[in-house]
Design a protein with these regions (language model features):
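Hydrophobic alpha-helical membrane-insertion segments, chiefly the h-region
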Residues: 17-29
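Cysteine/selenocysteine-centered motifs that mediate thiol-based redox chemistry or coordinate metal-sulfur cofactors
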Residues: 241-266, 273, 441-474
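Low-complexity, Gly/Ser/Thr/Pro-rich intrinsically disordered linker/tail segments
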Residues: 290, 318, 404, 468-474
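Extended non-catalytic domains of envelope/secretory-pathway proteins
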Residues: 309-310, 319-333, 337, 347-352, ...
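N-terminal Sec-pathway targeting helices
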Residues: 2-17
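Short catalytic-loop micro-motif centered on adjacent basic/acidic residues
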Residues: 87-91, 181-182, 316-321, 345-346
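Short, surface-exposed connector motifs at secondary-structure boundaries
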Residues: 81-87, 111, 311-318, 339-343
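HKD-type phospholipase D/PLD-like phosphodiesterase module
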Residues: 29-83, 93-311, 351-409, 416-431, ...
Length: 474
């Protein structure tokens, strides 16, 4: 294969960093042979899928392993292949080449395909330069390293044109002339985050969830044998009404498309949009999009809708959250708890024990930040609960969910993290779905995570509290 100019593609220290990841074995061990649980019934209009489901097994197409879980990428490919007229996608990150190839095929067959990305993840491999990565933080630098390794099929530390054409999702889209833009299309340097993860097909179907279209969010980290992907959910929803609502959100961000006027609207440039009902047979579905300006009533925001829905609980509340840092939601949960409603919460280990985590509030704890400051609005629960903690995850994997199950009847799910930034800055979505069949799927996922979770004041958390309090002289 012809090689690109070495000065362009031999990326110095960046390439050396790949050595930390090691080579990719052509064969990993299989940890799954048969499902351990029977599949739950699916609603005919709302199907729920989970990449860690114990009720199914699939073959990871990139790492060549058999593993438990629903193949979220294949679910999306099947939806793409069903498209007859149009596919509109808004997703923060997109690096999976099989998905890109499916879109390229539909584009070639006359289906209109349009893609919106977050600007930090919208540059194809062929246009990247070494200094593109020197300014990244450790998290994004590791992502860049893994993507480079993923595209470098023969693992020689150099990317060939053929490797890029086969493996780089954005290059595949560009070669197929799939139009795309990012959140700089409004003339700005980008919104807070274009954090959506949705697809609208033929004005009739919405595919939406918490997963980015990446190895880490769908299948697992490339260089970590034990990784099975960040825990995520995906919904396939058949509803022209819902598709129209998501289509309107897409249209605001798309404007007149690439190369046109800077008339795209992202972030707070979009008009205020209250929660609205969508018609889905057999369900009551509300949908709302972020952000909401801090100058508007908090109750009218997505976080306000979350708090309102939690406040209706009478039996139980179960939370599986990547991050939970919005104080008013914690305050609402305290009120619910005081009515005797059991509450259980799991938060990603990377965020659960940070000074701003509402998980600490629920446990009645306070933790100073690195400046020895306490959040001015911090409100630890006077009567703590011990059913709050972190799931046990494989190395490299995260609890990326953003869902709550209320009374085994209601699910809240979407791209929206329970944070101030998601509420007031980012492009996000939240669905409130009242459907016991759908709720049962999310309840099963919660129980899977809760089964071996580390709850309450763990030794690790106690050590963290003691260390920080000593450093701060408290």
């Amino acid at each position: 294969m012809q090689r690109l100019n070495s000065s362009r593609w031999r990326w110095g220290l960046f390439g050396l960093g790949l050595l930390l990841f090691g080579g990719i074995s052509s064969q990993f061990r299989s940890d799954a042979k048969l499902p351990t649980l029977a599949p739950l019934p699916q609603d005919p209009y709302i199907q729920a899928y989970f990449n860690h489901s114990q009720a199914s097994v699939y073959a990871d197409p990139y790492r060549r392993i058999s593993r438990y879980g629903d193949d979220l990428e294949q679910v999306m490919i099947d939806a793409i292949q069903s498209a007859q007229t149009s596919i509109d996608i808004a997703v923060q990150e997109f690096t999976l080449p099989h998905l890109a190839a499916a879109l390229a095929q539909r584009q070639a067959q006359g289906v209109r395909v349009r893609v919106i990305l977050e600007n930090n993840y919208s540059t194809p491999m062929a246009q990247r330069r070494p200094n593109d990565f020197s300014f990244l933080d450790e998290h994004d630098r590791n992502k860049a390293n893994e993507l480079y390794q993923f595209v470098d099929l023969n693992q020689d530390g150099t990317l060939s044109p053929d490797e890029i054409a086969q493996r780089d999702a954005l290059t595949i889209l560009d070669q197929a002339q799939v139009p795309r833009l990012d959140d700089t299309a409004d003339g700005s340097r980008g919104s807070g985050l274009m954090h959506h993860k949705f697809m609208v097909i033929d004005g009739r179907q919405v595919v939406v969830g918490s997963a980015n279209w990446t190895m880490s969010d769908i299948h697992g980290d490339l260089g970590v044998e034990e990784s099975r992907g960040n825990a995520n959910a995906l919904l396939v929803m058949e509803s022209p009404s819902l598709a129209q609502t998501f289509g309107a959100e897409f249209a605001l961000m798309w404007g007149d498309g690439p190369g046109g006027q800077p008339d795209s609207q992202f972030g707070l440039q979009k008009p205020p949009r209250p929660a609205r009902l969508a018609s889905v047979p057999g369900s009551v579905v509300e949908v709302q999009f972020s952000p909401t300006s801090p100058t508007r009533p908090w109750a009218n925001s997505v976080n306000g809708l979350i708090a309102k829905t939690l406040g209706q609980a009478t039996q139980q509340v179960n939370l599986a959250l990547f991050v939970f840092s919005e104080q008013p939601i914690s305050n609402q949960l305290w009120t619910v708890s005081q009515r005797g409603v059991p509450i259980r919460a799991l938060i990603d280990p990377g965020f659960a024990y940070r000074s701003y985590s509402e998980g600490l509030d629920m446990m009645g704890l306070t933790l100073p930040d690195h400046r020895c400051k306490l959040d001015s609005n911090n409100q630890p629960w006077p009567t703590p609960i011990t059913s709050v903690g972190v799931p046990t995850l494989a190395e490299g994997d995260k609890l990326h969910h953003k869902f709550a199950v209320v009374d085994n009847q209601v699910v809240m799910v979407g791209s929206h993290n329970w944070s101030h930034a998601a509420n007031t800055t980012n492009d996000e979505n939240l669905l409130v779905i009242r459907n016991a069949t759908v709720a049962a799927h999310f309840q099963r996922e919660f129980e899977r995570l809760y089964d071996d979770a580390q709850l309450g004041l763990t030794p690790h958390l106690q050590q963290t509290l003691d260390r920080q309090r000593t450093q701060c002289g408290l």
